[in-house]
């Protein structure tokens, strides 16, 4: 079995990695060591894991990605984005109206004359607006915080968030990552810096079938749960009044 084949498999299955060789490339050596290392907190009860505060990772750890969530954007916005991607006809009218307006209030202008020689300026202005929009989008991506659900080869599940810009939006489910020594682990969550994680790639094709629809259903269920929690809290407050 090759190292590349490990990237496409479920690491919780019984996998026999190829024998170590000094001729392996640096990337393959990292995969080998991370797979052979003892899984993080294997067999530790979940309540004890949550008690672990600011623990420093002391070895290379291999994980597979079960879920990627952009926690910078609201669930409702992400649901709308996915539904629009799946079926552009379902894009909400208010988003179409406000798309070019940015965050400011909608403004109207009364046109009293048309300068036919001003087409060049209009084109330049439109180009400038598009560039500004692209720059704003790029800046937003750099500021995005992602929550990753990770699984070790022992089957234990952990979470991770990035503390420096790391773009996980295109990460496929089943992708493999190696978390490096020096990473901080706090109450069940790895705090990732771009210099402390290696993205290996890979994909689990079964997990990614109808991925967008599955993720949309997942977000909708979480949104519904949040609403129930809010409504439940409101009812309790009314009962106590």
From Swiss-Prot:
<keyword id="KW-0131">Cell cycle</keyword>
<dbReference type="GO" id="GO:0031422">
    <property type="term" value="C:RecQ family helicase-topoisomerase III complex"/>
</dbReference>
<dbReference type="GO" id="GO:0003697">
    <property type="term" value="F:single-stranded DNA binding"/>
</dbReference>
<dbReference type="GO" id="GO:0000724">
    <property type="term" value="P:double-strand break repair via homologous recombination"/>
</dbReference>
<keyword id="KW-0227">DNA damage</keyword>
<protein>
    <recommendedName>
        <fullName>RecQ-mediated genome instability protein 1</fullName>
    </recommendedName>
</protein>
<dbReference type="GO" id="GO:0051321">
    <property type="term" value="P:meiotic cell cycle"/>
</dbReference>
<comment type="subunit">
    <text>Forms a complex with SGS1 and TOP3.</text>
</comment>
<dbReference type="Pfam" id="PF08585">
    <property type="entry name" value="RMI1_N_C"/>
</dbReference>
<dbReference type="GO" id="GO:0000400">
    <property type="term" value="F:four-way junction DNA binding"/>
</dbReference>
<dbReference type="GO" id="GO:0051301">
    <property type="term" value="P:cell division"/>
</dbReference>
<dbReference type="GO" id="GO:0005737">
    <property type="term" value="C:cytoplasm"/>
</dbReference>
<dbReference type="GO" id="GO:0006265">
    <property type="term" value="P:DNA topological change"/>
</dbReference>
<keyword id="KW-0132">Cell division</keyword>
<dbReference type="GO" id="GO:0008047">
    <property type="term" value="F:enzyme activator activity"/>
</dbReference>
<dbReference type="InterPro" id="IPR013894">
    <property type="entry name" value="RMI1_OB"/>
</dbReference>
<comment type="function">
    <text>Structure-specific DNA-binding protein with a preference for cruciform structures. Also binds single-stranded DNA (ssDNA). Functions together with SGS1 and TOP3 to maintain genome integrity. Essential for proper meiotic cell division. Required for normal S-phase progression and DNA damage response. Required for resistance to the DNA-damaging agent methyl methanesulfonate (MMS).</text>
</comment>
<dbReference type="GO" id="GO:0005634">
    <property type="term" value="C:nucleus"/>
</dbReference>
<keyword id="KW-0238">DNA-binding</keyword>
<keyword id="KW-0469">Meiosis</keyword>
<dbReference type="GO" id="GO:0043596">
    <property type="term" value="C:nuclear replication fork"/>
</dbReference>
<dbReference type="GO" id="GO:0006974">
    <property type="term" value="P:DNA damage response"/>
</dbReference>
<keyword id="KW-0963">Cytoplasm</keyword>
<comment type="similarity">
    <text>Belongs to the RMI1 family.</text>
</comment>
<keyword id="KW-0539">Nucleus</keyword>
<dbReference type="InterPro" id="IPR042470">
    <property type="entry name" value="RMI1_N_C_sf"/>
</dbReference>
